[in-house]
Amino acid sequence: MTNKKIKLTQTVKAAGUAAKLGPEGLADALAGLNRPADPRLIVGPETSDDGGVYCLTPEIALIESCDVITPPADAPRAFGRIAAANALSDIYAMGGRPLTAMNLAFFPACSLQPEVLGEVLAGGQDALNEAGCCLVGGHTVEDDELKYGLSVTGTVHPEQVLRNSTARPGDCLLLTKPLGSGILSTAVKGEMATVEQEAEAVAWMSLLNRAAAELMLRYTPSACTDITGFGLIGHSCEMALGSGVTIRLYLDAVPLMQGVTDQVADGMVPAGCYRNRSYYLSRIDAGDCDPERLLPLFDPQTSGGLLIALQPGAAALFQAEAAENSIFCVLIGDVLPRAELPVIVV
C-alpha cells in the first residue's frame, strides 16, 4: 500500500476507542482480580478511575495510565497526535501534570510502509511537546492492524488527586468537548462523512485537555473524569456509582459535533456504541427520550472532553472564565442524592 493512498480507518475493524473491549466483557474479565494490597496505592482499579495513583512522598504521587487505540482518522500524523492526546487526558482528568511517556506501537509491517509508523510517532511527539511531557522510550509489536498509544506517568500532590468517585449532591456537571467522535470516525471509515465533519472530528480529538484542566483546578472541583470508550452514559454511571449519587443529564444541553445526528440517521454508528447501550441501558432512567437521540450519549469517544463536577458558584465562574479564554464548556447536568438508578436523562 503506497503512502499516497492510505486511509488508515479502512485498515482496521473499528476506529479509535470504539475498538475497546465492551464494558460487559471487561467486567467479566476483571471479576476475579483482587485489589493490590499496598498502603501507598491511593487510587486503584476498584472505582474504574482514569489512572492509578501511587504515593511516593508526602508531597508527590505518581499517576499511571496507558491508552492504545486504532486509527480514528485517516492521516498517520493526525492519528498519532490524537492517540497521544487521548493518553495524556487521563493525567489531566486526575488533576496531574504529565511528566514522561513511552510509545506503544503495533504495526502491520507487511501492509504498511515504515514511513507510516514514523508519521504516527511524529504526531504523538507533537502532542507530547505541547504538553511538556518527555518521551523516554517505547515498544513495538508486529501486528495485523495498526494500533498506537502511550503509557504516561504524571505527578500530583497526594492530597489534590481528582477522582471520579467524589461527586456531591448539588454539583453542576460541565463537559469540555462535544460528543460524536466515534460516530464521525465510523462515517469517515465508511466514506460517508463530509470534509467538514471529518475536519471537525479530527480537530476535537487532537485538542489536549490541558487548558480546561488547568482552569478547572482553580475552582476546586468535587470530581472529574474524561469521556472515552464507554461514552458519556458509561462514564457518568461510573462517577455516580463510585460517588454514591445519581447524575441527571439534560439531553437537550448535551453538545454534539456537526453532522452527528445525520450520521446516526444514516446508520453510521459504531458497534461499540451498541455494546455500551446494551450494557448501560438498564442502569439509567431515560423516561420517554427518543432512543435515536440517546445514541450519541453511548458513543465511544476518542480523546473526549472532561466531565467536571463543580459546586454551582464555582461552575458559573468556571464557565465565565472558560468563555473569556475560548475554552469550550457546556453545563449538561447536575448531581442528585442517590436514587434507584445511577443516571437519569431528561
UniProtKB/Swiss-Prot annotation:
Entries under InterPro entries matching the protein: PurM-like_C_dom (IPR010918), PurM-like_C_sf (IPR036676), PurM-like_N (IPR016188), PurM-like_N_sf (IPR036921), SelD_I (IPR023061), SPS/SelD (IPR004536)
EC number, as in UniProt: 2.7.9.3
GO MF: ATP binding; magnesium ion binding; selenide, water dikinase activity
Keyword ATP-binding listed: yes
GO biological process assignments: selenocysteine biosynthetic process
Cofactor section: Mg(2+)
Reactions catalysed, as given in the entry: hydrogenselenide + ATP + H2O = selenophosphate + AMP + phosphate + 2 H(+)
Catalytic residues (UniProt): 17
Residues of the site described as Important for catalytic activity: 20
PANTHER family in UniProt: INACTIVE SELENIDE, WATER DIKINASE-LIKE PROTEIN-RELATED, SELENIDE, WATER DIKINASE
Family: Belongs to the selenophosphate synthase 1 family. Class I subfamily.
Functional summary from the UniProt entry: Synthesizes selenophosphate from selenide and ATP.
Name of the featured protein: Selenide, water dikinase
Species annotation: Trichlorobacter lovleyi (strain ATCC BAA-1151 / DSM 17278 / SZ)
Lineage per the UniProt record: Bacteria, Pseudomonadati, Thermodesulfobacteriota, Desulfuromonadia, Geobacterales
